[in-house]
């Protein structure tokens, strides 16, 4: 019996370590399943916006929500709370994903990261150029960034539908490319869609960043404590004129990638807990059992880096809550007053659709081909040009980020609806072609070792 007890500690530590190492697998599964939820949310929004409940749908998202504290009043409509507040949490998780990939993922080794970096740049430039060509004379070039984004959830969702016969390297490259795409999207939003910059806001945001660094310096590990500096950064960015949701990226990129230092080593905590459980009288002493279990949970928590722990906790909320709510709030485009025969609307729709459906795969495979042929990088094992083309099609699913950018690019409701329709059509075509081509790819590459997910 004592031998069994003595083996529990290393087994426990092993399980904790395995949980940390399999984080990317959990990420892939959550994102893949959330794609279905996102699709249902978007479809529901379209149905509501084009039904007898359209007015109710529209008025609901303009319902004011806020609170009063003495003479201080804070009130915004639900649409603002979703797009500017809830999406901050989405960007927080995105920032943590970027932080982890740079530290220990595919982006940690520059040689390994060259291919997805080059592919992502090509996948941003070509769609932007295509949109620019169609809309240059119409004066709607401000929407050039709409077809440049990739929706990780939808892309991985389609990849999941193809089953386990997809090479693992294809998963990794698509994920890395999408994360780099997120980095580029964040930079685009910060530098091209921020107006009337107020320097005083930078001081406020800088104060929030300084507070984060101070908290980390004195060893505060509780994530709840960082809500205050996060809110200060958010408010500072809004005052500055930069989209406030980018505060999430800043906070995510600052999240520690190493376990927080504790006075007692995590393994010592687990060892002490096991000693308590091994005591003779512990079997019937609920207080001692409870104390031991608390020590175990504390030890387990101390072994996992904050960036991994917080990301794991937030992912289900973002994947199954925030992103579907965002889709339901913003995908509701009414076709009643939309006139596709209008030159302005048509060119916006056409530019976005072709940018996503054609520009994304064209840019990704062209940039990758040039990089490989020039000797800058090489294709990973199990990877073929057919696989790169599949990644290109899936990267054309822009949905969430593309809609987000379109709302920053267009203030006119007619032009905004045109951009959203372009996003929905372009993303839908990319998903269908990607799925169909994916099955062809699997049949033609039966001998290539596949993912073991």
Swiss-Prot record:
This is Na(+)/H(+) antiporter NhaA. It comes from the Bacteria. The gene is nhaA. One of its GO terms (biological process) is regulation of pH. Pfam families: Na_H_antiport_1 (PF06965). It is found in: Cell inner membrane. Na(+)/H(+) antiporter that extrudes sodium in exchange for external protons. GO terms for molecular function: sodium:proton antiporter activity. Keywords: Antiport, Cell inner membrane, Cell membrane, Ion transport, Membrane, Sodium, Sodium transport, Transmembrane, Transmembrane helix, Transport. GO terms for cellular component: plasma membrane. It is a multi-pass membrane protein. Belongs to the NhaA Na(+)/H(+) (TC 2.A.33) antiporter family. InterPro entries: Na/H_antiporter_dom_sf, NhaA. It catalyses: Na(+)(in) + 2 H(+)(out) = Na(+)(out) + 2 H(+)(in). NCBIfam families: NhaA (TIGR00773).
